A protein has these predicted regions:
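N-terminal pre-catalytic segment of deacetylase/amide-hydrolase enzymes
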Residues: 6-80, 122
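Metal-dependent polysaccharide deacetylase catalytic core of the NodB/CE4 family, i.e.
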Residues: 20-32, 76-80, 88-187
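Substrate-binding cleft of extracellular glycoside hydrolase catalytic domains
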Residues: 64, 83-88
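Bacterial N-terminal signal peptides
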Residues: 1-3
Length: 188
């Protein structure tokens, strides 16, 4: 999944275009053939990384991308943010070693229930702490990964506060970044 976050402003500084937007590439699973709609083959992921390592691209941390949107800091044109949703175990097993090898920043969005319940196929809190300790940005994706547009305000508050409580206990702070499960939201 690829999206652009922007407020479309472009400035030229020293012949390098500076902009206040970045392209976000979102991944879910790596090397898990039985989930074709959310999986990327490892060979294909390596091809993505090879392309993104070319000088025409600028891989940035999500925090820098958000600063660009807020017009606090412009980023180079063709800046790319890598995000990974859902904290599947294949992230730690396959994607993390590749991203670490090339020192590429990324954000991992986590729903806390599947981690707390030790659901097979998901990362552990220990693995999430290892990523955090190595500079990976950890974001929230609620407690139970619900379809948020179906929730009332009390349910939304519950999902977010319980998730934040778990993050504080397990990694020492609540995430400053949030991703809507399924990309769905309501105006509450």
């Amino acid at each position: 999944f690829i999206t652009n976050i922007s407020l479309a402003q472009e400035v030229k500084e020293n012949k390098i275009n500076k902009v206040n937007y970045a392209t976000v590439i979102m991944y879910h699973r790596f090397g898990e053939k039985r989930y074709p709609s959310t999986n990327i083959r490892i060979e294909q992921f390596l091809e993505h990384i090879d392309e993104l390592l070319k000088p025409k691209y600028n891989i940035i941390d999500i925090k820098d991308g958000l600063k660009a949107i807020e017009n606090i800091k412009l980023v180079r044109d063709r800046s790319v943010i890598i995000t990974i949703d859902d904290a599947y175990s294949s992230v730690f097993k396959y994607a993390w070693p590749i991203l670490k090898k090339y020192n590429l920043p990324f954000t991992l969005f986590v729903s806390t229930d599947v981690i707390d319940n030790k659901i097979p196929g998901y990362m552990s809190w220990e693995e999430i702490r290892i990523l955090r300790d190595n500079g990976v940005t950890i974001g929230s994706q609620t407690k139970s990964h619900p379809h948020m547009h179906n929730l009332n305000q009390d349910q939304l508050i519950y999902e977010l506060s319980k998730s934040n409580d778990r993050f504080i206990k397990e990694i020492g702070s609540k995430p400053k970044i949030f991703a809507y499960p399924y990309g769905e939201y309501n105006l509450n």
